[in-house]
Amino acid sequence: MDYSNLSTDKLVALRDQLSNDIAKYHNFQMVRKIQLNSAYGAIGNEFFRYYNTQMAEAITLSGQLSIQWIANKLNEYMNKILGSGSYDYVIASDTDSIYLKFDDLIQKIMPGETDNTKIVDYLDKIVNKAFDPYIQKQFEILGNVMNVFENRMVMAREVIANKGLWTAKKRYILNVFDSEGIRYSTPKLKIMGIETTRSSTPAIVRKELKECINIIMNKDEDTFIDYVQAFKKSFMALPADQIAFPRSVNGLLKYTDSSTIYKKSTPIAVKGALIYNHNIKTMRLGKKYKQIQEGEKIKFVYLKTPNPFGGSSGEDHVISFPTVIPKEFEIDDFVDMNLQFEKTFLDPLNTILKNIGWETEKKNTLESLFN
């Protein structure tokens, strides 16, 4: 299609349509993935009509065998190319994917090269011409070894990234320059399992965490510290409903106690909901505000102690609320902003920072004293 003759309005409409199509087909893909995962899970459930533990075990074991097989074969291939003995170039693997380290190959073929575009071009080319056929050949060999009726194992290159950071199993960040052939002029973050992708993290914090990760991946520690401190300053001025943790409430009846409001070991969001309901009742606000109900979506914040919301001791440090905080609560004076900042923002950051040795604020050291 020749886009040069299209008007601006038509180009904008085409762009919007393309964005909608991308979202639509991505959702279709995710639906199929979830359906397949559900089917596998159901096979191992004794209440499913087609329950069969042997089938469930076969699915699990064939997946483990396939990914371990190809990881070992790619290590053999890389060691053969580089003459590196038995070095492990597979830095991570998951159910259906592996992450391969190409640093040594780049240094051998393109010594001293720092242009990311040239490096990505080379990796894209060599994967298509050499690694994809090699992987397919190895799966054919595995199929023959296992005497399969037909080999259905296929792998394709997903992303090319210059940096990766793992905080735990299935929790990682990649600085992506190419994703399935789509090239980015500035790297795009692929974030899996980190709090920026979780609905249980306040929306404004998710946004700022993502920007912090971008700085970690592409800038320096001083820039990062300055950004964190600037956000902390703005965070302290935000209203409670913007910085509160989103949750769903389950178990209100189970954890209710008529004398102490809630029982021991009550989950924090439920505890906050019971305290909220208690105050709606004792402050006689029931005609103006509904109490929180079972299964309802709420938010909760940490409170300073003592405060007027809990029992007689005033030591309860949390309160939940639905979409609207009753103005009669006058809650702003009691929200523990420092603790809320720590729990929503600093704690997720620190799970990343402990792996790279960075700090969230500048600290005086013996070296800095003499500098």
Stretches with model-predicted labels:
Residues 1-33, 52, 60-95, 103-371:
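DNA-dependent DNA polymerase catalytic subunits
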